[in-house]
């Protein structure tokens, strides 16, 4: 199933769709490094993304990065509500040369982000690295996920961010995996 949403503000104009059919993705955020990270997201999560974004990137990349995170989170929440039987929890460690990242995802209905990652530099190219946390906070809050992101070791900032994106994507993919269990994956009987 394809989930689609548009978001138009004074700062950004977004048209985003997400699906779990592994169809080809098309990502155009206007921010090269973010395009790269979201391409990794699609590959490692098993989800397809189509993104057409315009924003005030002449100011900086903040609004487009955060707003894309908001919409991806909202679309994930719609997808999760349609899925009744899924693993719920996902954990992944990803190494990238000198870097090691760990991400734990719980599709809990309780939005929380622990972002424990001190990135080595403030920029990768022109991309402000502080936007990595802003992106994940927007996704996690809007998808209502509990997520712990830990950068255990680092060195190269590009590797650090890439390992975090890959670990999140893999952990989310595991958590979304369908099961044959007919019960809601919560002892409460509900995930809201």
From Swiss-Prot:
GO biological process, one term: L-histidine biosynthetic process
Pathway where this protein functions: Amino-acid biosynthesis; L-histidine biosynthesis; L-histidine from 5-phospho-alpha-D-ribose 1-diphosphate: step 6/9
Enzyme Commission (EC) number: 4.2.1.19
Cystine pairs: none
Transmembrane portions of the chain: none
InterPro entries: IGPD_sf, ImidazoleglycerolP_deHydtase, ImidazoleglycerP_deHydtase_CS, Ribosomal_Su5_D2-typ_SF
Cited SUPFAM superfamilies: Ribosomal protein S5 domain 2-like
Main localization of the protein described in the UniProt heading: cytoplasm
Reaction(s) the record says it catalyses: D-erythro-1-(imidazol-4-yl)glycerol 3-phosphate = 3-(imidazol-4-yl)-2-oxopropyl phosphate + H2O
Pfam families xrefs: IGPD
GO CC terms in record: cytoplasm
Keywords: Amino-acid biosynthesis, Cytoplasm, Histidine biosynthesis, Lyase
CDD domains found in the cross-reference section: IGPD
Enzyme class: lyase
Annotated protein name in UniProt: Imidazoleglycerol-phosphate dehydratase
Native species: Staphylococcus aureus (strain MRSA252)
Gene: hisB
